[in-house]
Each structure stands twice: as structure tokens, then as C-alpha cells.
């Protein structure tokens, strides 16, 4: 359990920042002054409340989001070596690391946190580098690797780049590339753990990380595609996959149409011969006269009722 943070007042913080007689503040360069002032301000704010106590207790845990938040500032592109005789001791990595701590300053980066389907956290750096920052390294780990690589070359200064490439067991096509690329190829050949962050491999000749689009992200915009274009896409796929022996509909329709056009006209049907009907319908007055005179009506050509 994290112990309670000590409360810092403004006079105590200023006294600790300036030092006795102001000598500590006078011996600092502008970057160190800004860093010390920011640290004192953070301590004052943290002393007024216990909001950072929980964060301090969890500082020992691995937090990729916090690791990718701040990157060191400008540092030399290559580690600086002091050329002494072989009897003199060379500069160790700890001394160079202490020197780099003084040369760098915190710089905020634009980061993106994504979670993979398996639950793994992936933090990528999408910040834009200006031309003045293009020659700086982003991670201290890569800088230490470059330092060890340069120490190895300093120990074997008489060896040529071809011999160095053969020592790292690099293929022939990797012998003409830069030292940074040779180091990366060597780490990949030795199956060493790759850096967790893409900005760990950012060098002066390489751009910032580019995030490739995922397939599931592309499928989200499928509904925005033109429906007519999708219809022709499906139609093209359907036409490309045919069953063996299947007749194409278009060819079948055109063949039936040709058969219909090539036929002769059908023969005309025999027309019905109509017989004229000469029957005269008697009027009511004539029927009454015939009935009064006893004249029987003529025989009808058809029966009145069906038999």
C-alpha cells in the first residue's frame, strides 16, 4: 500500500528548487530549469490532494499508454565516443545514459490505444515530426542498442562493413544498407523480441508509423457502397461461376427468338358458311286474324320444346 505523499508548500518547493544561495538554479541550463520547475509544480499539486497516490502505487506496473505518452527530446543521432588509446578505458553505457538524461527533455506525443480481439493492448504513435526533429531517436532502448553496436565497431575498428555483416550472419542483399537497418535485420534473424511500440524503430530515414486498415473496419462501410455497383459486382461473380452443362439465359432467349422469327405463317382456318334465314316473324295483328279465320299456322322448322 502506497504511503501518504508528503505535502509541499510553495516556500519549501521554491527553496528546494533554487537551492542555498541560488547556486543550484544558476548552474542549470534552460532545459533543466524548465524540467525542475515542472517537477516542483507537480509536487505542489500532488501535496494538496491524494489523487496521485494511487497513480504512484501503480507506477511499478506495466502501462503502455503512459510509456508512449512522453518521448525524449533532441539527442544525437549516433552515440558520441571519446577516441582514447587502447590502454585507456572507454565510456560505458551508464555514463552515456546519464549524459543523454541531461540532453533530453520531455515532449508530448500523439498516441492511439487499440485493443486486439485477444485483449492485447496496442499503442501506436501518430505524432508528426518536423524537420528539426527528424534526426532524433524516439526511444532510449534503441539508442542503447545503437551505442552497443557502435562500441562493437569501435573494438573492431579494422574490420570492414562486409566482415561486420558476415559476423551478424546477414544475407548478401543486406550488406549495402545502413547500420540501423542492419541492426534491425540482425535482431529479426536472431528471433529476439521485437519492440512493443512502433516508434522504437523510428530512425532518421524512416517515416512515422503507418497503421494498416483492418478488414473489419473496411466491412463497416459496406453499406455506403452504391447499390447498382454492388449488383453488377454480384452479377459478375454469378456469371463467372457456372455449373457444367448450364445454358446461358441470354443465349437461350436469342435462340428461341430466332426460331419464332424463322417460322412460316400458320394456315388460315376454314370460315363458317352462313345460310340465310328467310323466316318472317308474324305480327300480332296477322296472328289475331289467322286465329279468327281458323287458319292454322305454318309448321315451324324447329320444335318449340326440346323432346
Swiss-Prot record:
So what does this one do?
A: Plays a role in ciliogenesis.
Question: Could you identify this protein by its name?
Answer: Centriolar and ciliogenesis-associated protein HYLS1
Record keywords: Cytoplasm included? yes
Disordered: annotated segments: 47-78
Q: Which Pfam families match?
A: HYLS1_C (PF15311)
| Cellular component annotations (GO), alphabetically ordered | centriole; cilium; cytoplasm; nucleus
Its source organism is Mus musculus
Keyword Cytoplasm recorded: yes
In what tissue types does this protein appear? Expressed in hippocampus and dentate gyrus of 3-month adult brain.
Q: What are the protein's UniProt keywords?
A: Cell projection, Cilium biogenesis/degradation, Cytoplasm, Cytoskeleton
Similarity comment: family membership:
Belongs to the HYLS1 family.
Any single GO BP term = cilium assembly
Localization per record: Cytoplasm; Cell projection, Cilium; Cytoplasm, Cytoskeleton, Microtubule organizing center, Centrosome, Centriole
